[in-house]
Each structure stands twice: as C-alpha cells, then as structure tokens.
Amino acid sequence: MRRVVITGMGIYSCIGKNQDEVKDSLFQGRSGIGIDPARKEMGYFSALTGLVERPDLKKLLDRKKRHSLAEQGEYAYMATLEAFRQAQIDEEFLLDHEVGILYGNDSSAAPVIEAIDVIRAKKNTAMVGSGSIFQSMNSTITMNLSVIFHLKGINFTISGACASGSHAIGMAYLLIKSGLQDCILCGGAQEVNPYSVGSFDGLGAFSTREDEPEKASRPFDKGRDGLVPSGGGASLVLESYESAVRRGATILAEVIGYGFSSNGDHISVPNVDGPRRSLQMAINDAGIPLEEIQYINAHATSTPVGDLNEAKAIAEVFGNHRPYVTSTKSQTGHEMWMAGASEVIYSFLMMNNGFIAPNLNFEEPDEASALLNIPSRRIETEFDTFLSNSFGFGGTNSSLIIRKFKENN
C-alpha cells in the first residue's frame, strides 16, 4: 500500500479568501457570521449565515465556462486555483497526466428554483438557458472543474450530506493508497444563497441569536440553540508519495487514517454508536496509539443532540487521553457539504503554525462536553497529528487522521 500525501490546499470561506487570510482569522478567533437581509425579507426564522463574497471570474474564465458554474462551483474554482498553485501543478502537467477529481456537493438549489421560476413565468422551457442544467445537477462542481482544468482521471461527486467533503478526501485516499490513481483533486463546496437552507430553517434547526451573530454558533456550550449555515469552497491535492517526489513537490502533510460508518438509525438525529465506530476505524487504519492524536476538530455544529452525542463518542474512544477538542464552526458556522474538507485545511493551518484556534462561545459545558478538553481561548502549542470528524443526515459518518509529513514515518 502506498503513502498518501497532501501537496496543495485552497480555501475560500467566510473567514478568508485564501490560506493566509484564513490562518489570520483562525489565530485571531475572528467570526465570519452575520445577517443576510434577504432571509429577513423572505420570512426566515433566522437570517444568520456565514458571509461569503461571490468572486468576480470575468478576468479568469470565459463567458461559456462561467455560464455553467453554479455559486458553489465559483467557490470551488477559486479554491482549486490556490491548491494547484501551491502543489505546483500547471496546465501542461494536467494535460499530460491523469489527475482525478472527487468533490463533495449535495445540493444546487438556486439554479433549480430560478429555472422553475422562469418556466412558470414565461411558459417556455427554452428561456431557461443552456447553462442551467450544468448548474443544477449535484455533480455541477466535478463536471465543470474537470472541463476547466482538463482532469482525466476519476471523476464523480460525493453526495454524503454534511460529510461529503470528508468522504471525498477519504475516497481519494483509498484510491491512491491502493494504486488505482496517482493524483486526485478533492474537496467540498457549499452554496450560501437562502434557497439552499429554506427547509432547514423551517425545521427550526438554526440559531436565532440574531442580536449577536458572532455569538450564535456555540459548539459544545450548554446554551447552544442551533447551527448557523455557511459555505464556500475547499480544495486539496492528494497524491502518492512517489508521485510527489517524482514531481519535486513540497509535501505538506500525510493522510494516515480514514474511518466511516452509518448509524442505521434516525434520519436526522445522530447517535453515539455510529460516530464511535467511525472514530475507531480511523484510528485502527492509522495504526497509531491514541496518545499521538493531539487535536480533534469536531463535527459539532452547535445543535443540542448532535454535540452531546459526539462528545460522548469522543470520550468513549479516547478515555483518559484528553486531546484538545474544538469545533472551528464556532467561527465559520456550518459549511455543510464543504465542512469536511475545509476543516482539514483549518486544522492543518493551525498545526503548521503552532496554535489551536479557540472554541468560541464555549462558556458552560454540558454533561458530555465537560468530559472533553475544550479550550475557549487560543492555545499556542506544537502538534503533529490531528483528527477531523464529519457527520451527516442519514447517519453518514467520516473521520480523517492527518499528520505532519516526515520521510521516515
């Protein structure tokens, strides 16, 4: 089995449009959450959201390519530019090699609704436009990026709810590890428009702390009252160690463990057993003692039951070993399909720069979070290995273990 390394990363989120901006936001404990006036006008119970600026692609892509990109595809494109740049992968390399793409996405709401509005108003399907179909499919990101970047390897979308981005990395890891692919672009993206979360809002799943947006997302805190939706794009370049060395690439980190499970239980209420099995599988796959995992970026979305059960699962698996545990969603909100990929990048940036961002708004633990080592202030510490959890509706669970690259690991 081959070693799987990370050679490039790109991030476009509510706390920064590139790695440098995001690293600074994490270090400062800066929130990217605010109020969306459009949601207030539409009658949403909560107008809270991660605030992500749409990129201007006019100088980067021709009109035809822009016409096929949905909002989340724009974010993914920007993240991919940064990831390929860092990996030192240019167009010539992409044309000459079979680079694959596995990307997490589980909705494309705005193009679907906009197309239906046109059909109902105009009574003419031709008025929808040629780009609509390519924007509205769940595979919109992989189909567009594969064309834009000439990707010739594996090409499909991972649709695994809020674990989509994490599973995309995990599947890329398995394919490269087994020798079926040498290099894969993977990640996740999430649209931020109001249409994408309307039904979520109707379920009462969102925090309603609109008077203090930066205090609304409060993972593990006893007073949490729901999640804050968010989005953006996160891309990573995974490749075999041999491929990276052959190219002379700088190796950033190594993926050493992937765990997954299904709860086989309630469609929206998480349990303890599924996450516990995912965690344990990742640790077994990595083949390392628990003590080597020094930090966990939890899935914790700031929901009462979800955070409670994840805390219980972590406590069961790790026992007396108490690594630092935080949820970067306290700064970003829940980036949903993107979160599993973005949180690997957030964790890497912290690991690479010797700090752990604070779990914002963690003021009082509940019965389960009291069992964990959750810092409410920034911790400046060196660590070599982290674990990232991502869970989703339908009971899909993913856990990834990443460590600093060392030649003799």
Positions of PLM-derived features:
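ACP-dependent fatty acid/polyketide chain-elongation machinery
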Residues: 1-65, 87, 242-254, 345-360, ...
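Condensing-enzyme catalytic core mediating Claisen C-C bond formation in acyl metabolism
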Residues: 3-7, 30-35, 211-286, 295, ...
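Conserved beta-ketoacyl condensing-enzyme motif
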Residues: 6, 27-160, 189-197, 290-305
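Conserved small-residue
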Residues: 8, 26, 80, 101, ...
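A glycine- and small-aliphatic-rich helix-loop capping segment at beta-alpha/alpha-beta transitions
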Residues: 20-27, 110-126, 175-178, 199-210, ...
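Active-site-proximal alpha-helical scaffold in enzymes
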Residues: 76-89, 138-141, 146-149, 155-189, ...
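Glycine-/small-residue-rich "gating" segment that lines the acyl/pantetheine channel
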Residues: 122-129, 170, 174, 191-246, ...
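Acyl-CoA/ACP chain-elongation machinery
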Residues: 180-225, 258-270, 298-307, 321-372
